[in-house]
């Protein structure tokens, strides 16, 4: 295992392990998320989309300020032998929301704060959609690492 230091090695710095290979690359904020993606690719024989989903689930657990199930996000995906695809995981307006409802309440635009500007979180559903379209493993396999970290620490 190699060591990856944040600054020059002076024997007092903390380190996180770095993993390297010849058939792919994984980069996440947390080494636990990276290791999850690595394991999904190498032990579980998943594809890059499976690995990304597993890493996102772990990242939401260990770094909820960076990625959360109640949030949003956009993914640019590149399936093999296909053009890139954008998967929009931004929040959705509630079904019954429309501008007329705002106008009748005296608003001329969507407010910056409060329940009227809140959207339905779509991060989690975008992970599922990515797996439906491009994944090869079942959700139980992909989520087992996040479950283990949540249960065992």
Regions found by a protein language model. Name each.
Residues 2-43, 48-153:
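Noncatalytic scaffold domains of N-terminal-nucleophile
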């Amino acid at each position: 295992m190699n060591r990856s230091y944040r600054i020059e090695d002076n024997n007092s710095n903390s380190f996180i392990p770095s993993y390297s290979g010849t058939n792919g690359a994984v980069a996440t904020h947390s080494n636990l998320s990276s290791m999850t993606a690595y394991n999904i690719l190498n032990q579980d024989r998943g594809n890059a989309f499976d690995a990304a989903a597993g890493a996102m689930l772990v990242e939401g657990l260990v770094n909820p300020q960076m990625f959360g199930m109640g949030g949003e996000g956009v993914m640019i995906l590149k399936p093999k032998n296909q053009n890139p695809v954008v998967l929009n995981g931004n929040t959705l307006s509630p079904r019954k929301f429309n501008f007329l409802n705002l106008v009748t309440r005296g608003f001329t635009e969507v407010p910056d704060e409060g329940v009227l500007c809140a959207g339905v979180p779509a991060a989690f559903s975008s992970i599922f959609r990515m797996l439906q379209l491009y994944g090869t493993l079942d959700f139980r396999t992909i989520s087992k690492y996040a479950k283990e970290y949540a249960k065992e620490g």
